Amino acid sequence: MEENLYDEFGNYVGPEVEDDEEEEDEDFLGGLDDDRDERARGDDEAMDVDGEKGADRSIVLHEDKKYYPDAEEVFGDAEALVQMEDTQPLTEPIIAPVRSKNFDLLEKKMPDTTFDFNFLAGMMDKPALIRNICFLGAMHHGKTLFMDQLVMNTHERDWKINKEVRYTDSRQDEQDRGLTIKATPMSLVVQDTKEKSYLFNVMDTPGHTNFQDEVIAGMAVSDGVVLIVDVVVGLTVHIERMLKHALQEKLTVVLVINGLDRLIVELKLPPTDAYHKLRYCIEEVNELLEKLYDTTGAEVESRTYFSPLKGNVLFSSALFRMMFSLESYSCIYADTHPSAKFDTKQLAKCLWGDVYFNADTNKFQKSPPDADQPRSFVQFVLEPIYKVFAHCLGEEKEDLAETLKEIGIYLHKKDYDLDARSLLKIVFSHFFGYGGGLPAFIDMIVEHIPSPKENAAAKTERVYSGDQEGSVATDMKALDRTGYLMVQTVKNYHRPDCNAFDVFGRVMSGTLFRGDRVKILGEAYSLDDDEDMTVREIQNLWIYEGRYRVEVSHVPAGNWVLIGGIENSIKKTATITTASNEEEVEIFRPLRFPGSSVIKVAIEPLQPAELPKMVDGLRKIDKAYPMVKTRVEESGEHVISGTGEIYLDCILHDLRKLYGDLEIKVADPVVEFCETVVETSSLKCFAETPNKKNKLFMVAEPLEKGVGEDIEKGKVRIDWDARRVSDFFTKNYDWDLLAARSIWAFGPDNNGPNVLVDDSLPSEVDKAMLKQSKESLVQGFQWATKEGPLCDEKIRSVKFKIMNAELSDDPVMRGGGQIIPTARRVAYSAFLLATPRLMEPVMFSEIECPADCVAAIYNVLSRRRGHVVRDLPKPGSPMYVVHAYLPAMESFGFETDLRTHTSGQAMCQTMFDHWQLVPGDPLDRSILLRPLEPAPAPHLAREFMLKMRRRKGLSEDVSVHKFFDDPMLLELSRQDAELSGYF
């Protein structure tokens, strides 16, 4: 039967057979057909709805077929970039990681404190309980360690006893260098001996001379200064200069004698010698005060001096965390002998000076009862401290425990296993009570430093440039928190990401609220020119605490504040007032610094494409450092000017790591120069305006010594009335009254060291017409003194006299476009005919070294055109102090050279002091400079000028044809054949 089912070829020819698999296939295919039908129906419906937007039935070529949707269809609003090749360098990741700068040492969370921050904010409304103070001292005199005692006693944390915290050194490079770079404020609630709370706003400042700008900014917002002096080192020139500035600002000063432990451990002085050293240190400071009072012209009634008997002197050892005054030490005796019931204030008066204790009568007397009787300070103050040191350093644990019990000090057993320094810290913290005697410091500040309300009137007179009788100044003098809002800003602090800055300042009157719209007045703002003014909204307000911030809603008058959201409108300092203030508000005076930024370097990015990033970084550098100057030369190079090598080193570090995040190339450092004259112009110079309708005549001559410095220091101001200005010059420099009344301007700005005088005669010049052109003449004069003809450096100590002026009757013909460049050109010609010279900055160097290193210092200085002013021993120590002058051009690497020749025993501090003439004639073309050979002294001026001109992209030599008209050249050739070598 099966044979009938197949043909002869084996093919199946029988009946159809039902197959389950075929049914499944049919079901599957049928389902697909159903889906196609449904999609087709859907497409038909869509076509019906969309009309012309339906599916296109036209034939599509293979190469035009679209197999995948476009990126815009898939990702919507996202931007899609298509690149045909990989242009990203291998060193750069495809997806860059999120970078966080961990340069600042910040608190990860709000620290625990002994006070509540709401309580602190409440105390801001009580100006009588506020003290704004600034720490002042030389480098390594213990300011930051002293600040640590305030921080440790107000912040609850497990502070490591064997480690110095240096809490206000909140930058990583400050910790690495062991050097404070930035002034850091902190606001703390502290208690005095009566447990009364006060709000202390404290500014810890750098001690290095290069960072004096930070100290000046700190003093600008303070009412008093805490002068911290190391008892071994004593006074330094940096302290002298900063103390002079504090007295000029009418700030109250108190004294802290630090380093008491050094007399015992390092110098190993007997107690009697230690007393004499302490007394000498105080007398040295008082002698300096006497000299500064005479210099500043302070009234005799307002002069205060330091004495432990007055309570304005504190003795301290910041390393061992102890401090005391005479009164606080007498309180220790009162607590130790409660049965005696003596007056602590009376006892304190007997603990200083030539006072002795008579054991037989139990009384103090002026004469010693015995020949070897020590003074009361030695017997009752120093000897107990010496004994504590001796027992802690020399006794075994068991004996030391018994000794300490006798004076009421009980320690844990584990404390005796600590090293000697840590053990002494713990012992002294028990010996002097809470905080190692911190209430003694609080008492001194509260008693001697005025509150913001008490000092408001004096502060306003010093910092406000407006009318002192106006309503704005009246509110500031009364510290009226409901009056006009006035805020003085002095510093800018970057945020942790270094992309933005917050502005730090002091509220002088009114109350600053978050969300206020305020007017920001820049340093160039005036009532006549309001261009430097913007309106912004306050986004954030903080109390700045060094390593963390406390946000607040408002800050009343008398307090310090950190402001967020307005930094784009502020370069250095600014004045902030309410936007709705309709009063005529003038600015707070910009900060004035005793030194100058004379060291400069030229920089450029390693990758030229990163130039915009570097320029943005330079803007941030300009905000972060008060004394830095950044500018672009005509050659296109970017120049940074600073006070010294370490100052510039910190700036370049911040530019690379924080603000620019790029690699830069740095040129060799150079210095700023000035141009001056040493004689009067050989003839009356003249220049014609381009339209040949006006002619100006001028001569130049040297300015009297000291005039330029007085103008720069603000002792005389051009905005005074004419009588006041003339009185200054007639009384101080013997100017005749006519010349003093004829002063028109200072240059290159209103505080510049050059003077423009109208010396023309009314019989020769139409004074009314000349006065109409005064503004243009002044602008030309200031332009000329800003960029001198020798090498585009500032002109200094030159008096320019307008001798005559032939002016057109038509005002259009004598407009600013004609007069300004002509005034500049005639000033240049008068300058070049007055024997021009170059001036270079000279640095003052204070060198501390052992006596056997003094000879090596002389040798190092002699090779750098320097000379020693004096060298003298430091009393009570084995050190010598050498004072020397050194040209800034020769100061690069001086400190390294000095330490090399003294085996690291010498330490120096260098700062700008004055300007001096560079030897030689810069216009002497007979001088030939040989490459790779040092130029002799008479050739230095020529060498400096040529190298500066080459660096700035100027022509090789000064072109006289550029500054002299043809008639003037003919006059010169006839007048003096000796000048022919210049043409």
Which functions belong to the PLM regions below?
Residues 370-502, 509-512:
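Accessory interdomain/linker segments of ATP-dependent helicases and helicase-like nucleic-acid enzymes
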Residues 197, 205-211, 219-271:
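Conserved Switch II/interswitch segment of TRAFAC-class P-loop GTPases
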